[in-house]
Amino acid sequence: LEQEVKNLDFAAQDFLTVNMGATAIGTGITAEPEYAEMCIEALCKITGLDIKLADDLIGATSDTSCMVGYSAAMKRVAVKMNKICNDLRLLASGPRCGLGEINLPAMQPGSSIMPGKVNPVIPEVMNQVAYKVIGNDLCVTMSGEAAQMELNAMEPVMAQCCFESADLLMN
């Protein structure tokens, strides 16, 4: 998982390039010439981050690859966590048949017809989290390709999916 965390950090760097002052389609028309510089300066001061203005404001307005990339990095974490949880479920299968290589702590009552059975509820919950993150990534991917010309009207659902996935993975 250490490599996946590094991938998340790397993907997050794309969010430091913004299109402030680009206006609706990235031309900057009707915006005060100093607006972008003032915004960048204020954002850097407020966040303490090294935020930069995009070189191509038109491209930055329609391109949502920063969200697509970050969502994909979160999906990689989810896929790896899912595999680990599947391994835990298999290794903990038992007690009379199955591998029974490890014993997971009982988090709830087991089966009434199989005494001693411990349901792998924590790995199962993590499987469900992974499936949701993977589904959110599909939504972000499809929304990213839904841009038409200079504008992507799908950014709200992309942001919602990214925030939800981040929240699920952190908790």
Short names for language-model regions:
Residues E2-N171:
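Conserved, well-structured ligand/cofactor-binding cores
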